[in-house]
Amino acid sequence: MRPTFTSSHRGGSGSPLVCLHGFTDTWRTWDLVLPALERRHDVFAPTLPGHAGGPSLDRPFGVNEAVDALERMMDVAGLTSAHIAGNSLGGFLALQLAARGRATSVVALAPAGGWRRDDPLFSDAIVEHFTAMQELARAAAPYADSIVASAEGRRRATEFITTEFEHIPAELIAHQICGVAACTDVGPVLEVAVRDGWELAAERITCPVRIVWGSNDKVLPWPSAAARFREEWLPHADWVVLDDVGHCAQLDTPLEVAELIG
């Protein structure tokens, strides 16, 4: 069955919370934590521009353009500020929004951009990973339902982003495969990221920040991918390392992540 992609999710009641997904993902990466979060929060989870279900792109976006787009989305949603949680690229964008004064707190799960500037091989590895991942996803997407019908298929489909997969619904894994395949402009967006680099005006962040990292992250390995956050940008943040957890902690250990978001 071909999945349906939507531009955002809104649900729950309480203090406002914005949840931001990672590169090539969609808002549904938060599916497993939403029930717990929506008991305490008015949750707004948008899909980023250029991603499956999200706004189309006139040109490949960089970080500033992505943050501009998220500010517009928050404005339309009636959110002047909010608690913000983000994974990977979404974690980095959450911190950028905090630097613009739009966050009352941030929980960043394995945020992107924290590797050392003098490590070009890291950037090259990220580009190669996402390029290869999308090629695989596009080849697999027509067969996604068949792939996730077996435990081995579900394990292989999630092995780079989680260490545990048994609790993740097959339908959600199939949606993830097809979402990666449908993400537009992966190559050009990565080129912009490499060209522009990753910078954070951390001195402008005045809200509480918690950074969460899985010790078994295969996409942004701990601790090398966190170097600039730990040494330069946010050494005094509340740091949490989750043992034997992968890159997408919200999928790997959803109950623990819901508690960490608060």
Residue ranges and their predicted role:
Residues 103-141:
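Flexible "cap/lid" loop of the alpha/beta hydrolase fold
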Residues 9-56:
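Conserved HGGG/HGGXW glycine-rich cap/lid loop of the alpha/beta-hydrolase fold
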Residues 47, 83, 105-107:
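Residue in the alpha/beta-hydrolase core beta-strand immediately N-terminal to the catalytic nucleophile
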Residues 239-258:
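Catalytic histidine-centered segment of alpha/beta-hydrolase-like enzymes
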Residues 64-82:
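Conserved acidic catalytic loop of the alpha/beta-hydrolase fold
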Residues 35, 203-245:
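Conserved loop-alpha-helix segment in the C-terminal half of the alpha/beta-hydrolase fold
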Residues 86, 90, 94:
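Gly/Ala-rich beta-loop-alpha elbow adjacent to hydrolase catalytic centers
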Residues 142-204:
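Conserved alpha/beta-hydrolase catalytic His-Asp/Glu region
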